[in-house]
Structures are given as structure tokens and as C-alpha cells.
Amino acid sequence: MLLWSPEGLHGAHPDRAVRQRTADYLVALVHFAEALGAGVMILGSPKARTAISPLTPAESAQMWLETLEPALKVCEVTGIQILLEPLPETDVVQTLREAVALVEQVNHPFLRTMLDVKSTLAESPDVPTLIRRYAPYIAHVHLNDANLRAPGYGTTDFSPILQALQLVGYTGWASLKPFDYFPSPTTFPLQK
């Protein structure tokens, strides 16, 4: 949502005015998600949360949470859940472990995390164990291979991942999230 535009937004910026604009934008996105009938809003956006000097990643994570507070208040009315997406491309919340720690710290009923297979593989090759460990916190799943392609177009074995999700009783959405549409955007969904 914040990855490429609008320009000038950052949830952990040292400038309070930038954080306020970002907070206002997140509130607007919650209302937009409600209008669409969405149940969740995934907050990935590594460029909009990476630590900016002189802040450390830990300090930035705390600022990021403060920036989320107004949106979480609106979530109490709309029922939208905000999901922190762990991303190794940033230095703020790279792993499920870190995301769950922040979710536990905030202890808000509308703040959870999600599982992105590609990103989780950077944390551990044993994704099923992480699913079992963090199941109560996972409210959405992105299915993508470590090579950025769709399941079946790389070396990741999705069978144990899907079995673990079933074992823990996961009933939420799972979306395909390839970044490389090999062999082509029009043919990859029709193959395999």
C-alpha cells in the first residue's frame, strides 16, 4: 500500500509530520478496505518502514506501531484487521518471530500477522514448524516460491506447508503472490 506511492509516507520517519501523514493515510486505507468489503489490510511496504538514521530498527519498530494506533482505533469500528507482514527486505520486522513479538506487545484484537512463504523461507527452511508455532497470529497467507515464482515453478515443496496450515485449522485466505510470472503472465495460471 505504501511501497511505491503516495510519495513521502513512512511509518517510522524521524519527522513527526511525515508519520502523521502516514497515519492519516492508513486511516483512509482502513475505510477504503471497509468499502471494498475486505476483512484484512496487509502492511508490507518495506521502504515505508526501514529504519532511518539516527533511529535503530528497534526504535523504528516502536514508531511504526505508534503510527498504526489511529488506524487500529478505526479498525475497532470497521472490523478490518491490520496484518504486519514480515519482510527480509527491510530491517524493521523481518521475521514472523519479530512480527508476533510486536503483535503481542500491542495486544490489540485487530492487529495480527501473516505468512508470506518466500519471506518465511528467509527466516527458516522449516516453514511448517513456524506455522505450527505462530498459527494463532496468522490471518492471511501468501503462496510464493523462494525464486519469486508461483507455487510449482520453483524448488519449494508446498505440500508440507499446506498440510501444516490444515493441521492448525487455518481457514483464512491464501493468495498466489508471484513476482516473476514465468513462463508469461498470460500462460502461467493455465499451466501445471
Region annotations inferred by a language model:
Residues 4-10, 47-51, 143-149, 181-183:
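Conserved radical SAM core fold
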Residues 9-113, 124:
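Active-site acidic/histidine proton-transfer and metal-coordination neighborhood
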Residues 1-4, 42-44, 83-87, 114-116, ...:
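A cross-family glycoside hydrolase active-site/sugar-binding cleft signature
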Residues 4-5, 73-75, 137, 145:
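Short, flexible segments with low predicted structural confidence
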